[in-house]
């Protein structure tokens, strides 16, 4: 099922980039991309316009604009959401993929309190601020039919998809800051889904394990033993493509997922299915 309506994507690289391009291909009526790096957001918006042209959806994509956001700053988030509302008129889909990865991999006895705090500022507080602001916006929007030829699906004011992690289900050695933050995001997703359900707003998360993104590539450079850990822990024998995660996000945004809220979709090539001994 295609996604119509307008989309607000936070995060201009990796999974966020893949989601924005997927929205452009699928014919959204408008798109706003936000990132702490405004130049990256502007570049992605231009790429989305070109992608819509190549996919034959340029007529549907009325606009693709960019703005800056620091998700850990309340005022910055409010300004970005206001920009999206002004440009798009309404936000039907919000995908929040902003986040940071581990820089210092240590056992808990040697873990950095500074990095722990930084991880929570972006990955937890940032997720909270974005979900809070977008929920408030969507509550003011008129409900629209989920699918006109299937009235039993009811109406919707919008949906939010948060990028979680398989680390919310299984811990990774020497990554206490990331594992703890992603467990918090899991709880936030469930709480937001419960609070928003009566307003016709769905909230879900996608929880991948290792994905081929710039953040993971940096982690592989910073933590030499990580590559072997990945190779031995993923039953499918490879890491995910960002496009594969975007496909899951598109499903959760689509009418096909109209009864899904509070879900935390694990997308990990089987990583969390078993323990790994030896």
Curated annotation (Swiss-Prot):
List of catalytic residues: 178 (proton donor), 182 (lowers pka of active site tyr)
Induction (free text): Expression is increased in rice-extract medium (REM) and is correlated with the production of pyriculol.
Annotated pathway: Polyketide biosynthesis
Lineage of producing organism: Eukaryota, Fungi, Dikarya, Ascomycota, Pezizomycotina
Stated name of the protein: Short-chain dehydrogenase RED2
Residues annotated for NADP(+) binding in this entry: 15, 70, 132, 178, 182, 211, 213
EC number: 1.1.1.-
UniProt KW keywords: NADP, Oxidoreductase
Record carries keyword Magnesium: no
Family membership: Belongs to the short-chain dehydrogenases/reductases (SDR) family.
Protein's job: Short-chain dehydrogenase; part of the gene cluster that mediates the biosynthesis of pyriculol and pyriculariol, two heptaketides that induce lesion formation upon application on rice leaves but are dispensable for pathogenicity. The highly reducing polyketide synthase synthesizes the heptaketide backbone of pyriculol and pyriculariol. Pyriculol and pyriculariol contain several hydroxyl moieties and double bonds, so it can be assumed that several reduction steps occur during biosynthesis.
Enzyme class at the top of the EC tree: oxidoreductase
Taxonomic superkingdom: Eukaryota
CDD domains to which the protein is assigned, alphabetical: SDR_c (cd05233)
Alphabetical list of SUPFAM superfamilies matching this protein: NAD(P)-binding Rossmann-fold domains (SSF51735)
GO molecular function: oxidoreductase activity
């Amino acid at each position: 099922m295609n996604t119509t309506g307008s989309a607000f994507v936070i995060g201009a690289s990796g999974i966020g980039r893949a989601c924005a391009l997927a929205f452009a291909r699928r014919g959204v009526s408008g798109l706003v991309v936000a990132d702490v790096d405004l130049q990256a957001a502007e570049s992605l918006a231009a790429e989305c316009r070109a992608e819509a042209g190549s996919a034959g959806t340029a007529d549907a994509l009325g606009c693709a604009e960019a703005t800056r956001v620091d998700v850990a700053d309340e005022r910055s988030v409010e300004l970005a959401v206001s920009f999206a509302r002004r440009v798009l008129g309404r936000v039907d889909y919000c995908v929040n993929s902003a986040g940071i990865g581990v820089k210092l991999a240590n056992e808990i006895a040697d873990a950095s309190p500074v990095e722990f705090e930084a991880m929570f500022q972006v990955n937890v507080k940032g997720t909270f601020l974005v979900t809070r602001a977008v929920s408030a916006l969507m509550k003011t929007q008129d409900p629209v039919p989920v699918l006109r030829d299937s009235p039993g699906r009811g109406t919707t004011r919008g949906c939010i998809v948060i990028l979680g992690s398989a680390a919310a289900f299984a811990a990774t050695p020497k990554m206490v800051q990331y594992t703890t933050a992603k467990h918090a995001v899991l709880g936030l997703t469930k709480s937001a889904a419960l609070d928003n359900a009566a307003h016709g707003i769905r909230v879900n998360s996608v929880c991948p394990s290792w994905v081929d993104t710039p953040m993971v590539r940096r982690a592989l450079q910073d933590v030499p033993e990580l590559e072997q850990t990945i190779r031995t822990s993923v039953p499918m024998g490879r890491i995910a493509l960002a496009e594969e995660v975007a496909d899951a996000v598109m499903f959760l945004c689509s009418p096909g997922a109209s009864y899904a809220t509070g879900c935390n979709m694990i997308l990990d090539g089987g990583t969390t299915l078993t323990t790994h001994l030896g």
